[in-house]
Amino acid sequence: MALPFSRSADFPVDKPGGSPCGNLRADFGCSIHEELRPRGWTGCTVFDCHGAGQQVSQVTFAGEDWRGSPDAARRMFAVFAVMRPVHELLAYVADALDRPETRPVHAELRRARTGLSELAGADADTVLAADVGALRAAVNPALLRAGDLVRACSPRRGPVHRGADLAGARLRGADLRGASLRGALLIGADLRDADLRWADLIGADLRGADLSGADLRGSVYATGTQLAAARGDAATSPFGGRHEQRPSQSSNEIPASGSGSPVH
């Protein structure tokens, strides 16, 4: 609901932000959930707000229905635009805190988690006043150090491809243990049988990448959204951390949940 999208390989139609999706049911569920991929709604199957939609609708606005007031709807959508990156940062911090190898920065990560959690639970005015860019800048150094600590556990010094354009790259069987792939563009990359253990995958774009047989155990900051946007098979080893969703194994595979959020 809150976010816009354009007609593309991920969506079959255009939708402006703040406009209800034509597939939204009265109970906020999706009327075509079981057929999203075959109908061309792949973007919906890989979207994850990290719980921000539920936080805004159920906590910040205490269950208020945006359909009853255009003004309330606009305010809720504005809060969601801030809440989503806050919850994304919380997810990354939680991933880093789950790892014993990142213990040297646990205190800093816990302080970041406390500040972000307090903001997420604040009133709408406080959330709207937050500077998302400043929040990212404050948390990113600890996340970067945590990622480096994970990468240091690799038996070999991994390559640094931070922000690299590796779209369509032929990396089948590549030894990418301990690699930095932060923000790398890996759309359509061939990563079959690649070894991605201890790799830092924060922000890596894996849409359409082939992870069949790839080993992602112990990789850091990869999310279920990233894996859902990639392709894989039964031999793809799940990655470590908090997320266990495998890459899509067929064009029809979608996340199991069919319920929508009042803000989505």
Regions found by a protein language model. Name each.
Residues L144, A152-H264:
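Tandem repeat scaffolds
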